[in-house]
Amino acid sequence: MDQNKLNRVLESMKETGIEQLLISDPASINYLTGRYVNCMERMQVLYLDVEGNHKFVIGKLFPQPEMGVEVIYFDDTEDCVAKLASYMRKGTKIGVDKIWPAKFLLRLMELGVGTEYIMLHLSLIISVRSRVQKNRT
């Protein structure tokens, strides 16, 4: 995991009030981890938490080498969203990248993890931080 890039994203999350972020876009995951993974219709998500409890959740069919974040595997018979939810904090605002399939988001909402869900793109959260910094000067 690129610590400088991660720190920029975490700062942006704090400034925008997003405590947890779900990133499923392979290009965005690659940007932060240096690993390009595309599981097609299966869930893959990089979970970022302002408290530092980061996870990469992916199917067992796609084993990952060390990437600087704990990798959590699920198999095709498990409820992958429930597994992800078990690591998330309840009662916070959650940022969800714009390409995460609705079937996963709806299941997460059904599990009652977040109080609010904000659809965004990683580049948007980084650009919000840039605008905030410019306004401070």
Which residue ranges define each predicted feature?
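Short acidic-hydrophobic, aromatic-tinged amphipathic segments that line or gate anion-handling sites
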Residues: E70-V81, I118
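Short, glycine/acidic-enriched capping/hinge loops at junctions between secondary-structure elements
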Residues: L32-Y36, V57-K60, M67-V69
